A protein has these predicted regions:
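Left-handed beta-helix
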Residues: 1-5, 214-443, 448-450, 454-455, ...
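Short coil/turn connectors at secondary-structure junctions
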Residues: 4-6, 57-58, 81-82, 112-115, ...
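Catalytic metal- and UDP-sugar-binding loop of GT-A-like glycosyltransferases, i.e.
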Residues: 11, 120, 420, 465
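A short acidic, often aromatic-flanked loop/helix-cap motif at beta-alpha or helix-coil junctions
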Residues: 91-96, 157-159, 190-192, 284-285, ...
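Conserved core of the sugar-phosphate nucleotidyltransferase
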Residues: 126-254, 272
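Noncatalytic nucleic-acid binding interfaces
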Residues: 462
Length: 488
């Protein structure tokens, strides 16, 4: 019997602002070590492990944005050796993202109309993976019967942070039990959420879907015709760049944002395709809030979640995390969240966390960079940590991965001093090439062409001291870059 091809689609473009200061725009929650490893890697390993006798799981398709491309690549390459990561030119919500992925899947599988998409978010936590995998296999079976399958989670509390699915009558296909969908409901008030919990026929909308690729293409073209035309044109003009697929920006910028639910799923009841909901009972969270992080972790006898360098005395129902090496001393707190990073601290009452975006607006007015980047900034070649800065100087600790290099570049307004702390550096400076070992240093004059290379099999660490009138990251002129980056 011919096996069906199944394409997992991982949507990984979110910013995770509700987990500030841990999650930032350029290093959002799907790349954080929340559950022992980052959730993108965990999602990829989980879906890649699913096997069945009637289908072939294909390489996952990751959809993200330009700013996160190297983060996505670094965390995908273990599981996806030959895939393309689709880079949206601009964020347009989840429906256009999925349509791009479906066009890619169609290109990979032009002769088979029965291929199935499994749509997943990159930032979900699953407790019982065996049960989850069985649910995914059941969803594939239902999708092959031309059903559009959505996963719901049985509520364990009156959560106001999720949309809800109202279930209709129970149905059965073979050994698979599912429900028809009666209605979708927006994130409710606490009063409504309690009502949903009491009535028992509501599920949290987990945002996990399974359906035939051809059905998604047809539905999107039916309900989002103008967007479909623009995305089709954008995809036709795409550029492949190593692991990345870049749709045309001019066409894609004209696309109107819309979610999968609003654009298509909530309109399916008027179509020939049955909308089926499977109940997930495997332990699930979208890790979208500090409350959600607390819920999945071990709590002490006073209902506190404590992590890192923390001394906690007489605290109740609080969440205290030291995410750097700072010691936090906390005493007599009740219903309080304290999150410490190396450049920002959040202190809030549990009841005010839904208003975090108001606080972030104020922080953005004072120091916008705190919303975008950590002090430790990741690059395709490694990372740097800004240790100190002041009038006309900046000090960085720079780590370069094995067999990696920075771009050949120059700076108009700054000079640099490099000291090797660990490893061996190969330096290109104008027409010279030389080696620096541990405890050796060099000076990089402004306007000189230079490049830092690690040809070794272990990490290279240097301390860089910048001096000059303009120490901005925009003061980089690139002459050659192995990662395809251009000067800002």
């Amino acid at each position: 019997m011919k096996k069906i091809k199944v394409y997992p689609v991982i949507l990984s473009g979110g910013s995770g602002t509700r987990l500030w200061p841990w999650s930032r725009k350029n290093y959002p929650k799907q790349y954080l070590n929340i559950i022992g490893e980052n959730t993108l890697s965990k999602t990829l390993s989980r879906i890649s492990s699913i096997k069945g006798n009637f289908f072939l799981m294909q390489n996952p398709i990751v959809v993200t944005n330009e700013d996160q491309r190297f983060l996505a690549l670094d965390n995908s390459i273990t599981y996806i050796k030959n895939t393309k990561i689709i880079l949206e030119p601009t964020g347009k919500n989840t429906a256009p993202s999925l349509y791009l992925a479906s066009l890619y899947a169609k290109d990979m599988n032009k002769t088979d109309e029965d291929s199935v998409l499994i749509v997943l978010s990159a930032d979900h936590w699953i407790k019982n993976e065996s049960y989850f995998n069985k649910s995914i296999i059941n969803s594939i079976k239902l999708a092959l019967l031309d059903k559009v399958v959505i996963m719901g989670v049985l509520p364990v509390n009156p959560n106001t942070g999720y949309g809800y699915i109202e279930m209709a009558e129970k149905k059965r296909e073979g050994r698979i039990n599912y429900n028809k969908v009666l209605a979708f409901h927006e994130k409710p008030s606490i009063k409504k959420a309690k009502k949903y919990l009491e009535e028992g026929n509501y599920l949290w909308n987990a945002g996990i879907f399974s359906l035939k690729n051809e059905i998604w293409l047809n539905l999107f073209n039916k309900f989002e015709k103008s967007n479909a035309e623009l995305i089709n044109n954008s995809w036709k003009k795409k550029i492949f760049d190593n692991h990345f697929a870049r749709p045309n920006k001019n066409d894609f910028d004209k696309v109107k944002p819309n979610s999968i639910d609003y654009a298509v799923i909530e309109k399916i009841q008027n179509c020939k395709y049955e909308l089926a909901v499977l109940s997930l009972k495997c332990g699930w969270s979208d890790l979208g809030t500090w409350g959600a992080i607390k819920e999945i972790n071990h709590l002490d006898k006073h209902n506190n979640y404590i992590k890192g360098e923390v001394v906690s005395i007489d605290n109740v129902n609080s969440h205290i995390m030291s995410l750097d090496k700072k010691m936090i001393g906390a005493m007599g707190l009740k219903d309080i969240v304290v999150i410490s990073t190396n450049d920002a601290i959040l202190v809030a009452n549990n009841s005010k966390l839904d208003d975090l975006k108001i606080l972030l607006k104020g922080i953005g007015k004072k120091n916008k960079s705190l919303l975008n980047d950590h002090r430790k900034v990741f690059r395709p070649w490694g990372w740097y940590d800004e240790l100190d800065s002041g009038d006309k100087f900046k000090t960085k600790r720079i780590h370069v991965k094995p067999k990696s290099s920075l771009s050949l570049q120059s700076h108009m307004f700054r000079s640099e001093h490099w000291v090797v702390i660990k490893g061996k550096a190969t330096i290109f400076l104008d027409n010279k090439k030389f080696i620096l070992k541990e405890n050796e240093s060099t000076f990089i004059p402004k306007k000189s062409k230079h490049r830092l290379v690690n040809n070794e099999n272990k990490m290279l660490e240097i301390i860089e001291v910048q001096t000059g009138n303009n120490l901005s990251e925009s003061d980089i002129k690139r002459f050659d870059d192995v990662y395809g980056r251009k000067s800002k």
